[in-house]
Amino acid sequence: MGTARFLRAVLLLSVLLMVTFPALLSAEHHDGRVDICRLPSDSGECSRFFGMWYFDGTTCTKFVYGGYGGNDNRFPTEKACMKRCAKA
């Protein structure tokens, strides 16, 4: 029973890595810098409710930010988001 549970955990971890790793790679520039505009929205770890904006690959979209943590694809206004992430 313990071996089956361990193998299930390894399989789950493998699937999570296969799904997550390409997304992280696609956010990197060739020189190793992360393009914050390609990161997914991340509401953070707290339970506050701040209206913020993130770039979804096409346009800026409003989301609720918890106030702590998350990533840098987070802007206080739609204008700031578009200025940083929208390509001319």
Curated annotation (Swiss-Prot):
Organism: Cyriopagopus hainanus
Lineage, broadest ranks: Eukaryota, Metazoa, Ecdysozoa, Arthropoda, Chelicerata
Database matches in InterPro entries: Kunitz_BPTI, Kunitz_BPTI_sf, TFPI/VKTCI-like
GO cellular component: extracellular space
Residue span, BPTI/Kunitz inhibitor domain: 37-85
Top-rank taxon: Eukaryota
Record-linked Gene3D superfamilies: Pancreatic trypsin inhibitor Kunitz domain
SUPFAM superfamilies in the record: BPTI-like
GO BP: envenomation resulting in negative regulation of voltage-gated potassium channel activity in another organism
Signal peptide: 1-27
Biological function: Serine protease inhibitor that inhibits trypsin at a molar ratio of 1:1.
Protein name, entry field: Kunitz-type U15-theraphotoxin-Hhn1d
Tissue expr: Expressed by the venom gland.
SMART domains (alphabetical): KU
Pro-piece positions: 28-33
Positions bearing the site annotation: May bind Kv1.x/KCNA: 39
Disulfide bonding pattern of the chain: 37-85, 60-81
PROSITE patterns noted in UniProt: BPTI_KUNITZ_2 (PS50279)
GO molecular function: potassium channel regulator activity; serine-type endopeptidase inhibitor activity; toxin activity
